[in-house]
């Protein structure tokens, strides 16, 4: 048995106690890391960083110093890269290729296949054509030859392609795209971007217009009610209770108590009016406190008793009436003061206790929210910083690749300019005048997606006026040979689309075109993402248009 030091034991205990305090922060960091992992899942694994580029440049300098040809080394590297890409493409084709059995005796489910699939689909599967989800076969930009009759679907696919390229290349911090369904507008085909300020302004203007158009609520005015003793009575007022006891000498005690106790001397009509008014004004009256209701009940009982006592005294001795009035008034005033003070004290104490409980609950909630916010701020900021640094690294890598490629092209042009050498200074000036910055060579232009697409498009589509507009817009992206888009950027844009937009044939063709010809994203990765979003089988029936 080995003894554990006391410091290690204390560290273990404190770490166990601190686990439950930061459980919420761990959940937030896990969510942020999951988001970043989803975005960086489809990023190229072998990222050439600055250190590798510097090592490569030093190696090239050493090789040139030894005596090896600089351009020969570059050609060998390019040939090796192309060979590796070709081998990878062949492997993917072999994996996706349909390989039927050679002998019919080995096929056990041949009859089932013939019953479920038609002959054309079997021929296409045997030929090695991969059936993509939601993509049409005949009128498709991915097809090797496009028919001249299908102009409308090709125009819609070109509009969706421009919208997708625009969404992939804009700065999302200041700009945003208009809805995808607006890209098929013949006045503005392909859609356009807009600033966030302008969109918010349009929303506020629309809300104001809707508020202006909607009819205002009509106020229902009630007819003025007939004022009676019961309708004008409000028990919460202090003056009504004071008038209960302080009566003038000339007025009788019965008339002074009629404002509280409903008398039997009133006619039946006044009672009906009183009931109607009380029922109509019941929801408008303020809700009385419990102690005030008890106080009113006590006052009413006292008033009834005094009326009974005074009626008996009037029968027996009318001379004692004035004395009884004074005694009763003084006694009632003192009793009302004591009950009012006690009710006020009890109501204030109960209200203070209730307010203290509410304040304690609100403080605990505020403290809990502050703790959650503070624990989540670090994880959110870390995730944002990681995503920004990742994007900056990708931009740097793309720029370095473009600069290296253009530097190689300029070096070749300079090398070929020294055909006949005469004088060093003359040759240098001749090279500087002749060499111009040319973007791309003949092979790169021939293999580019834009020029390949233009060669496939039918003449009817090129003469179609809305199609001319969309082709002019696509020219901006097509002539940019240095366009680089990462797979995670495509998935981030597609995440904001709705399911019916992803399943639309025209939009699906545009997504497939961008994935295969521009981004070069593996098909398996895209299908896995699409299945997690749309929940469809791997092989879906195509739409014949």
Swiss-Prot record:
One of the Pfam families matching this protein, by short name: DUF4698
Chain segments carrying region Disordered: 224-284
Coiled-coil intervals, chain numbering: 72-99
Biased composition, class Low complexity, residue ranges: 238-259
Annotated S-S bridges: none
The organism's place on the tree of life at top rank: Eukaryota
InterPro entries noted in UniProt: DUF4698
Keywords tagged on the record: Coiled coil
Protein name: Coiled-coil domain-containing protein 60
Gene designation per UniProt: Ccdc60
